[in-house]
């Protein structure tokens, strides 16, 4: 595709997305179905604006690659090990059972047994991109059904390797002598990637983070994702699997949230491109010619996979209200079918329009999933109105923070220690990489990143947290963060550090009433001790401290609308005279009751 054609295609993709997705959302059919319909409209079987579908479809697979990297970031190796039973148990059972049933049904038509086997395996796979997108939209990520769904998708990615290796064997074109040397080299290369990633990625990102240039960090993240995808593709393995492994290797690093933030915009755009490309690939000519065959095939495919998945969910012990969600979200065909069926076609396993029929079936099955999930939602809403089963409780990984602490210098560390000592779940965001490395050694959950990025706050748990404590060194960052929280996370209770009186004024103007002036409190405490050292009774000095604090806060509030220096000086003189009168009355009262302690606010 030439440069001008590529630019034209880019403009058409953006126009289709901007026009179709908001319309689809307004109609209540979801963004994914909107992308698919937009692809049909601009593709060769629609208005014909774009004809080179295969090249664009291959490029758009990067959306799945970026998505799998982010999924890997959310899973550390220990959690992945905990999922081994569901990955190799339920995942393997789903692929084998679905493939056997679907292959048997294909053999009842004109498919040879070899073509039926490949067709059954390809149709047994689900769309990673669509399933994960729908699981996020439905809030399934932290549910048991969502975890099981991810396990099934992960096994399907692993099954790509033997499935592709099976094609030449079924076609009878496999080499007589198996090339063990070539296989050994691939295994060594894969092991080298794991070892290198395990010991090199953190030091490399630490070096890049020390530069303090955000654009370089983003470039390094893109290099990691695309490089690992290209490396796995060169080995003949799944690109998505490679980036997933890279994500897992960085899941426990302090850069996790910053990596998510850097990747997320690219992931969203490329996923949209992928769904548009799938819509463009729909061959309306084959659909029109074999309408009955395709319609029956789509219904049978969705029904078989839904039934298999539902039964496996029941055997696994998924609660009844989540089984249909789990089955429905994985009921479609997947993007891997395009790769597998193209490989099989090059080996002449399919005859006539067989490959086109299968691809049309896969594409239409993807379009049924958002509609099926809407039906499941309606069914669930009726089910949830009934009495709950006492033994069934929602499974939630309760690691969401109660408090987000922004900045972990000396001020923030004191707050963090107090919160952790009282068993509060906190997530800390810090831009000083040396502080991040130091605090992580002491068991703090500290992450490297710029907290003024909305997506970073969201991925750090701002939507679930109750409070945010802002201890930034720069007043500009503090005020920007307050504005972001007010706009995007209005439920958060904002507490902030004010370095001085000016910043305290700005916080009050922004509506933040819970703040602490770092020098004010410590200076006031030292002043109280000074009064005691000069002979004042301790409780009298305590009262003096309290009155001074109250009056100072009142002055702050009254001076907010006053901007001239003369007005502030005049008001400060009045406050000083008022404070002297208060102290005079207190001293007279204390002479009558020197040993009494008052309760004060």
From Swiss-Prot:
<feature type="transmembrane region" description="Helical">
    <location>
        <begin position="55"/>
        <end position="75"/>
    </location>
</feature>
<keyword id="KW-1133">Transmembrane helix</keyword>
<feature type="transmembrane region" description="Helical">
    <location>
        <begin position="4"/>
        <end position="24"/>
    </location>
</feature>
<comment type="function">
    <text>Pore-forming subunit of a potassium efflux system that confers protection against electrophiles. Catalyzes K(+)/H(+) antiport.</text>
</comment>
<feature type="transmembrane region" description="Helical">
    <location>
        <begin position="230"/>
        <end position="250"/>
    </location>
</feature>
<dbReference type="InterPro" id="IPR004771">
    <property type="entry name" value="K/H_exchanger"/>
</dbReference>
<feature type="transmembrane region" description="Helical">
    <location>
        <begin position="324"/>
        <end position="344"/>
    </location>
</feature>
<comment type="similarity">
    <text>Belongs to the monovalent cation:proton antiporter 2 (CPA2) transporter (TC 2.A.37) family. KefB subfamily.</text>
</comment>
<keyword id="KW-1003">Cell membrane</keyword>
<dbReference type="InterPro" id="IPR006153">
    <property type="entry name" value="Cation/H_exchanger_TM"/>
</dbReference>
<keyword id="KW-0812">Transmembrane</keyword>
<protein>
    <recommendedName>
        <fullName>Glutathione-regulated potassium-efflux system protein KefB</fullName>
    </recommendedName>
</protein>
<dbReference type="GO" id="GO:0005886">
    <property type="term" value="C:plasma membrane"/>
</dbReference>
<feature type="transmembrane region" description="Helical">
    <location>
        <begin position="262"/>
        <end position="282"/>
    </location>
</feature>
<dbReference type="GO" id="GO:1902600">
    <property type="term" value="P:proton transmembrane transport"/>
</dbReference>
<feature type="transmembrane region" description="Helical">
    <location>
        <begin position="152"/>
        <end position="172"/>
    </location>
</feature>
<feature type="domain" description="RCK N-terminal">
    <location>
        <begin position="400"/>
        <end position="519"/>
    </location>
</feature>
<feature type="transmembrane region" description="Helical">
    <location>
        <begin position="356"/>
        <end position="376"/>
    </location>
</feature>
<feature type="transmembrane region" description="Helical">
    <location>
        <begin position="29"/>
        <end position="49"/>
    </location>
</feature>
<dbReference type="GO" id="GO:0015503">
    <property type="term" value="F:glutathione-regulated potassium exporter activity"/>
</dbReference>
<dbReference type="InterPro" id="IPR003148">
    <property type="entry name" value="RCK_N"/>
</dbReference>
<keyword id="KW-0472">Membrane</keyword>
<keyword id="KW-0050">Antiport</keyword>
<dbReference type="InterPro" id="IPR038770">
    <property type="entry name" value="Na+/solute_symporter_sf"/>
</dbReference>
<keyword id="KW-0813">Transport</keyword>
<keyword id="KW-0633">Potassium transport</keyword>
<dbReference type="InterPro" id="IPR036291">
    <property type="entry name" value="NAD(P)-bd_dom_sf"/>
</dbReference>
<keyword id="KW-0406">Ion transport</keyword>
<feature type="transmembrane region" description="Helical">
    <location>
        <begin position="207"/>
        <end position="227"/>
    </location>
</feature>
<feature type="transmembrane region" description="Helical">
    <location>
        <begin position="87"/>
        <end position="107"/>
    </location>
</feature>
<feature type="transmembrane region" description="Helical">
    <location>
        <begin position="115"/>
        <end position="135"/>
    </location>
</feature>
<dbReference type="InterPro" id="IPR020884">
    <property type="entry name" value="K_H_efflux_KefB"/>
</dbReference>
<comment type="subunit">
    <text>Interacts with the regulatory subunit KefG.</text>
</comment>
<feature type="transmembrane region" description="Helical">
    <location>
        <begin position="177"/>
        <end position="197"/>
    </location>
</feature>
<dbReference type="Pfam" id="PF00999">
    <property type="entry name" value="Na_H_Exchanger"/>
</dbReference>
<keyword id="KW-0630">Potassium</keyword>
<keyword id="KW-0997">Cell inner membrane</keyword>
<feature type="transmembrane region" description="Helical">
    <location>
        <begin position="284"/>
        <end position="304"/>
    </location>
</feature>
<dbReference type="Pfam" id="PF02254">
    <property type="entry name" value="TrkA_N"/>
</dbReference>
């Amino acid at each position: 595709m030439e440069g001008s054609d590529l630019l034209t295609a880019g403009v058409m993709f953006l126009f289709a997305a901007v026009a179709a997705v908001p319309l689809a959302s307004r109609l209540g059919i979801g963004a994914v179905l909107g992308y698919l319909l937009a692809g049909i409209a601009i593709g060769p079987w629609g208005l014909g604006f774009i004809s080179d579908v295969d090249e664009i479809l291959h490029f758009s697979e990067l959306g799945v690659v970026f998505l799998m990297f982010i999924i890997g970031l959310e899973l550390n190796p220990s959690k992945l090990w905990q999922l081994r039973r569901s990955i190799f148990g339920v995942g393997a059972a789903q692929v084998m059972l679905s493939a056997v049933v679907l292959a048997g049904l294909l053999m009842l038509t004109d498919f040879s047994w070899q073509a039926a086997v490949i067709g059954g395996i390809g149709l047994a796979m689900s769309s990673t991109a669509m399933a994960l997108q729908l699981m996020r939209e439905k809030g399934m990520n932290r549910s048991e059904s969502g975890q099981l769904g991810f396990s099934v998708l992960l096994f399907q990615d692993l099954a790509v390797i033997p499935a592709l290796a099976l094609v030449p064997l079924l076609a009878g074109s496999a080499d007589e002598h198996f090339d063990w040397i070539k296989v050994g080299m691939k295994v060594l290369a894969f092991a080298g990637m794991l070892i290198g990633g395990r010991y090199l990625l953190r030091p490399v990102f630490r070096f890049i983070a020390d530069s303090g240039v955000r654009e370089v960090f983003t470039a390094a993240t893109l290099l990691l994702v695309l490089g690992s995808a290209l490396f796995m593709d060169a080995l003949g393995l799944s690109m998505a699997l490679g980036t997933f492994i890279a994500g897992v290797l960085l899941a426990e690093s302090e850069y996790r949230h910053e990596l998510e933030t850097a990747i997320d915009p690219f992931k969203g755009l490329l996923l949209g491109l992928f769904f548009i490309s799938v819509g463009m690939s729909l061959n309306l000519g084959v659909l029109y010619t074999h309408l009955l065959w395709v319609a029956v095939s789509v219904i049978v495919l969705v029904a078989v996979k839904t039934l298999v998945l539902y039964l496996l969910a029941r055997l696994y012990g998924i609660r009844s209200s989540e089984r249909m969600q789990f089955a429905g979200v994985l009921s479609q065909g997947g993007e891997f079918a395009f790769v597998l069926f193209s490989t099989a076609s090059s080996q002449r396993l399919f005859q006539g329009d067989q490959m086109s029929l299968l691809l049309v079936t896969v594409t239409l099955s993807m379009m049924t999933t958002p509609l099926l999930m809407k039906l499941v939602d309606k069914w669930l809403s009726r089910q949830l109105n009934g009495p709950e089963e006492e033994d069934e409780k929602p499974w939630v990984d309760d690691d969401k923070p109660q408090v987000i602490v922004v900045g972990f210098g000396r001020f923030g560390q004191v707050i963090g220690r107090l919160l952790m000592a009282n068993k509060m779940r906190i997530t800390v965001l810090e831009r000083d990489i040396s502080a991040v490395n130091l605090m992580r050694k002491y068991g703090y959950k500290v992450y490297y990143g710029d907290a003024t990025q909305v997506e970073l706050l969201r991925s750090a748990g701002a939507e679930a947290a109750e409070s945010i404590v802002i201890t930034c060194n720069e007043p500009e960052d503090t005020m920007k963060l307050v504005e972001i929280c007010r706009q995007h996370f209005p439920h958060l209770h904002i507490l902030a550090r004010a370095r001085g009186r000016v910043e305290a004024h700005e916080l009050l103007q922004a509506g933040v009433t819970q703040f602490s002036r770092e020098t004010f409190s410590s200076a006031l405490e030292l002043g109280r001790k000074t009064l005691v050292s000069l002979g004042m009774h301790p409780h009298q000095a305590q009262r003096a401290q309290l009155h001074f604090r109250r009056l100072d806060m009142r002055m702050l509030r009254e001076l907010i609308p006053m901007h001239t220096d003369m007005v502030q000086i005049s008001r400060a003189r009045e406050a000083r005279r008022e404070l002297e009168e208060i102290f005079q009355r207190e001293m007279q009262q204390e002479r009558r009751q020197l040993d009494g302690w008052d309760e004060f606010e």
